Amino acid sequence: MYKKSIQVAAAAIINTSGEVLIAKRPDDKHQGGKWEFPGGKIEQGETVLDALTRELHEELAIQVVTANPLIQITYEYPEKIVQLDVWQVTEFSGDPIGNEGQSIQWVAKTQLFNFQFPPANRPILQALLLPDYYLISGDFEDQADCLRRVQAAIASGIKLIQLRTTEKPIPLDLVKALADYCYQTNVQLLIKQSNCSREIYNLKGISGVHLTVAELMDCNGAVITQYQKQGCLVAASCHNAEEIVKANALALDFITLSPIQPTASHPGQLGLGWKTAQQLIKLAQCPVYCLGGLSSSDVGQARQVGSQGVAGISQFWPS
């Protein structure tokens, strides 16, 4: 059955306190009565930024000064397909008002999940909460060495970490030490699912699990729902369209896409390159971190192709 497809520009408007502006949809509209990020349809001949600038002036009486891409989402409702192109507006002039009679509200990012949004908006909430960089731990000598490296990474500004180790089961003392420190410093710590017992992912300071490709392809929605109901983030490693489609079906919180560039750890394996990465990222219905042969200086390029940011091991793991 043919479904109408509409292209929408939406804005996550951030004030100087780090709060996000949301607006309530009119009751008589599609997904009426729910909260949304301001914006509207992209008219023929408009760029996304043109549409966003026009819509925010019409809806909120503000002028966009600085805006950057945040995430692109394609979501299929029973009655239509919505293609959302979301930008983060970090500078604007004027005081926002509900210019069309709509309710508006400034909300702390961490409180966004307390509001009811259309289903297509869920990835936007995650994108706003996730940082630009995702550290995947490298080799370490012992617990003290691992903790020292994690502390150094956090001191440099890292806010999202995956503890990656081949030890099974993973030493509980190590996880507790890292979880305690991450909790104290407001850093999110993920554990590989294969290393993650119920005792571990219930620890204060453990924010979620990261699935390998094999775990992703073998996983079912009930497992993911169980994790997410307990407040856990669920991420996965992806390398191709098939794996991204599976991640979409499971409604994961974010994924990594690799390898973007050739890496020393996989000699002879070609990287996807930025053009292919951009095409694959467009398939994803959640934030995507680019991984493989990248450094922190690549975050701008990653953002330009629609990524949340960059992930890394060797370039991010302190010596």
Task: List each model region and its residues.
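Conserved Nudix-box catalytic region and its N-terminal flanking loop in Nudix hydrolases
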Residues: 19-59, 70-71, 188-190
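Conserved, mostly hydrophobic/aromatic
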Residues: 135, 161, 201, 247, ...
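Glycine-rich phosphate-binding active-site loops on the catalytic face of alpha/beta enzymes
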Residues: 208-221, 254-268, 293-319
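Active-site-adjacent beta-strand/loop module that shapes the phosphate/pyrophosphate-binding cleft
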Residues: 73-95
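NUDIX/MutT-family hydrolases
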Residues: 86-88, 96-129
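Active-site mouth loops of central-metabolism enzymes
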Residues: 130-145, 234-236
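Alpha-helix-loop-beta-strand connector modules within alpha/beta enzyme cores
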Residues: 174-194, 213, 221-240, 269-295
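Conserved N-terminal beta-strand and adjoining loop/helix that marks the start
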Residues: 1-20, 72
